[in-house]
């Protein structure tokens, strides 16, 4: 049975609360998922019930257009997350799940994790991970990340179509930097705390994203559209997509930044049951 926002929202709220905080002790088996994003690297741990119990997040420019351009930086962050989690739980993770943008080489993410000392227990593309987490049927998933937007169509629990477009939060930052006449780094920081203020300037970028999504889902006969990714947290996004797709039920849970990391960690729990930190 498909999960809904009432099922998902408390898990995302828990993840947001735990982010870079010291978690409570637990005796549960633990599964790790690592999300290598364009703007951030997130390592999330879930327990036997699929509940988030720890989240490490670093804002980092290590991935661009689905390619790890700063390999050493990415490996260093993942190792630091592993050290932090070992200190917190008293156990070292040896396996982790990860993901990749549709249409790119999964070895890119796998190589980072292996170089950090991990064995990859499961790997899948980002929108498929979200679709699996939510157990969707007859729905579309749009994962707007930092550098790319992943799109997947799910029918009867199976992904029947997926694509990746080179547009995302990085392009929003570029637009904002030009509008404000500030550096790209300043724009990245500014947009996180001034969402409503910057909406008029960045709205055209999201309109373009919605047009791209419309092209990919045309004729697919879906009834629901789920939005994921940190770039969806911009105020105004949900309303824009609902106006663009009035015939669809558009879902945008709070704290969508953590949807893909939760989906990745959960996929490891489901697909690699025996591979966990004990």
Curated annotation (Swiss-Prot):
A Gene Ontology biological process term: ethanolamine catabolic process
Keywords: Chaperone
Classification via CDD domains: ASKHA_NBD_EutJ
Descriptive protein name: Ethanolamine utilization protein EutJ
Superkingdom to which the source organism belongs: Bacteria
Upper lineage: Bacteria, Pseudomonadati, Pseudomonadota, Gammaproteobacteria, Enterobacterales
Pathway the protein contributes to: Amine and polyamine degradation; ethanolamine degradation
Family of the protein in this entry: Belongs to the EutJ family.
Gene name as annotated: eutJ
PANTHER family to which the protein is assigned, alphabetical: CELL DIVISION PROTEIN FTSA-RELATED, ETHANOLAMINE UTILIZATION PROTEIN EUTJ
Biological role stated in the UniProt entry: May protect ethanolamine ammonia-lyase (EAL, eutB-eutC) from inhibition, may function in assembling the bacterial microcompartment and/or in refolding EAL, suggesting it may have chaperone activity.
